[in-house]
Every structure is written in C-alpha cells, then in structure tokens.
C-alpha cells in the first residue's frame, strides 16, 4: 500500500535518510494518519525512472506523478471529479513547522527529521505551491486537526488542504 510520496533532502547509505517530509493526495474523506490514508496500488499501474514516477492510487481513483529537478520536485495530481479532494503534508516528528497561506495557494515549513549524523541545527525547508485555490485548509499536530490556526510548530505537525476538482 502507498502511504505517501516521501521527499528527502538527501538519501544517504551512510547516515540514512534525513530531511524527509511527505505529501499524499486523496479523495472522499480526509485521513491524516499515514496508515489510514494508504491506498492500494499495482506495480502494473506504476512507472518509475530516475526522472519520473507515476502511480495510480486505486483507493482514491486518481494518479500521482512526480518529476524531480536539481532543487525541487514537481507533482501532478489527476483527481476524479470531487468536492472533497485533499492533499496532506506531513513534516514528520523530531521537530517540525508548517504554515498554510491560503491567499497564495501555498504551504511553507520545515522538518528536522533525521537518523543522526547531521548538525544539531539541521532543517530542511519546503515551499509547496498549488495552482488551484483551497476550499479547505487546516494544520494538525500528532494526527489531530488544530482549529483556528494556519501555522504550527511542534514535535510532529502537518497541513491538510482541500479542493473541488473536475475530472482530469
């Protein structure tokens, strides 16, 4: 099952992954916990190369694509027609920060998640921009939505945004 699309500052065979955070699109019901939001997929409906990854998420009847660049990655989510399409950003534990900026269709933040071997002040910053306005936006801590806030810093935080989508 596909639980998320994980982004890393640097995968390393010597000190493991560090600076990782994840992005997961979904439809129907918002699910923040990575195990409950997981979707079935088939390797037959997956394409993986060093420069492109695509997978059909059968649980949500949608396709997710990622194309990495030297400094960032481009995502494309092909949703079905839905009034409840979401994207969850998980900045993981060990200290993280997120801020949703609805007027700019943007989420910014950082993660300090690592497996050791990095400086004490290590942070991997991210900026996520969307090409559609949000119809829903929340932040969460320890898998619980936090009301009345669009910015949060704690051990384990994330953001959830929603859209109304047309097919394709």
Question: How does the language model describe each region?
Answer:
Residues 1-4, 8-167:
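Accessory carbohydrate-recognition regions in carbohydrate-active enzymes
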């Amino acid at each position: 099952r596909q639980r998320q699309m994980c982004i890393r500052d640097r995968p390393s065979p010597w000190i493991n992954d560090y600076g990782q955070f994840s992005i997961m699109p979904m439809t129907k019901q918002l699910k923040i916990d990575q195990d409950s939001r997981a979707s079935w997929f088939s390797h037959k409906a997956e394409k993986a190369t060093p420069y492109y990854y695509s997978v059909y998420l059968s649980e949500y009847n949608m396709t997710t694509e990622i194309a990495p660049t030297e400094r960032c990655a481009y995502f494309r989510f092909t949703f079905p027609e839905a009034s409840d399409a979401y994207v969850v950003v998980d900045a993981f534990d060990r200290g993280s920060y997120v801020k949703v900026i609805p007027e700019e269709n943007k989420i910014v933040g950082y993660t300090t998640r690592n497996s050791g071997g990095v400086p004490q002040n290590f942070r991997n910053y991210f900026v996520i921009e969307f090409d559609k306005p949000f119809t829903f936006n929340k932040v969460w801590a320890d898998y619980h939505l936090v009301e009345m806030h669009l910015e949060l810093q704690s051990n384990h935080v994330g953001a959830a945004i929603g859209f109304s989508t047309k097919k394709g």
